[in-house]
């Protein structure tokens, strides 16, 4: 079985999870519809102002609602930043390999922008493969966000890199940035090498 064949569809996994949780996402509404709703409710108006800010965001129809700009592996002991640019050539990322020293603690940081409408239930999903077999699946709930000019930043909880002779080697990751409506905001692939030392 090839690595491609071994990779399940994200939608199938999410459907299974949603049915177990009996979760039904709310219907999607545009930013304008949300702003028009409950105008007479002072507390809701205040909440929406807090979420959306004072300045209306210009909705450029050519820009996607959610733009994922970069992913970083945050580790205090790393000799330099470990960052991948997600606005350029995603195919090139498949040829690069990022390095983590075995056993170190690190966090995944994702930078993204919401450009037009409020997006509900953003999540980051990562499938990890080794020699074509899936060895891990992680799902991180990112949350709901309104549009604004500045980027948002999401940090996962602290994780520990695998360690030991058997854990060292190269892992292939398939990452998804999606939401409650199963909108695929970005899917990309990248490689991570677990080594005995940073400079090995």
Curated annotation (Swiss-Prot):
Assembly information from the UniProt record: Interacts with RHOA. Interacts with RAC1. Interacts with RAC2. Interacts with CDC42.
One example GO MF annotation: small GTPase binding
Keyword terms: Acetylation, Cytoplasm, GTPase activation, Phosphoprotein
Coiled coil: none
Record InterPro entries: Ig_E-set (IPR014756), Rho_GDI (IPR000406), RhoGDI_dom_sf (IPR024792)
Subcellular location: Cytoplasm, Cytosol
Residue numbers spanned by region Disordered: 1-39
Residue positions where N6-acetyllysine is found in the record: 20, 24, 39, 46, 101, 123, 174
Gene3D superfamilies in UniProt: Coagulation Factor XIII, subunit A, domain 1
Domain of life: Eukaryota
Function: Regulates the GDP/GTP exchange reaction of the Rho proteins by inhibiting the dissociation of GDP from them, and the subsequent binding of GTP to them. Regulates reorganization of the actin cytoskeleton mediated by Rho family members.
Biological-process GO terms, alphabetical: negative regulation of trophoblast cell migration; regulation of Rho protein signal transduction; Rho protein signal transduction
Major location (coarse): cytoplasm
A Pfam family matched in the record: Rho_GDI
UniProt feature, compositional bias: Basic and acidic residues: 30-39
Keyword Nucleotide-binding applies: no
Gene, per the UniProt record: Arhgdib
Phosphotyrosine modification, residue list: 23
Expressed in which tissues: Preferentially expressed in hematopoietic cells.
One GO cellular component term: cytosol
Family: Belongs to the Rho GDI family.
Modified residues (N-acetylthreonine): 2
Positions of post-translational Phosphoserine modification: 144
Name of this chain's protein: Rho GDP-dissociation inhibitor 2
């Amino acid at each position: 079985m090839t690595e491609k064949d071994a990779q399940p569809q994200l939608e199938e996994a999410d459907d299974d999870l949603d049915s177990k949780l009996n979760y039904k996402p709310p219907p999607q509404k545009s930013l304008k519809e949300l702003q028009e709703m409950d105008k007479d409710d002072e507390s809701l108006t205040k909440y929406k102002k807090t979420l959306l800010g004072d300045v209306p965001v210009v909705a450029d129809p050519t820009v996607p609602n959610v733009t994922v700009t970069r992913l970083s592996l945050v580790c205090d002991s790393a000799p330099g930043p470990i960052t991948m640019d997600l606005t350029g050539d995603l195919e090139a990322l498949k040829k690069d390999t990022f390095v983590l020293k075995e056993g170190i603690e690190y966090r995944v940081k994702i930078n993204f922008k919401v450009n037009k409408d409020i997006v509900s239930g953003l999540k980051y999903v990562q499938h990890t493969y080794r020699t074509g077999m899936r060895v891990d699946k992680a799902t991180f709930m990112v949350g709901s966000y309104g549009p604004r000019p500045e980027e948002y930043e999401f940090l996962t909880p602290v994780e520990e890199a695998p360690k030991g002779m058997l854990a060292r080697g190269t892992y292939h990751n398939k990452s998804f940035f999606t939401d409650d409506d199963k909108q695929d905001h970005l899917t990309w692939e990248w490689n991570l090498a677990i080594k005995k030392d940073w400079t090995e």
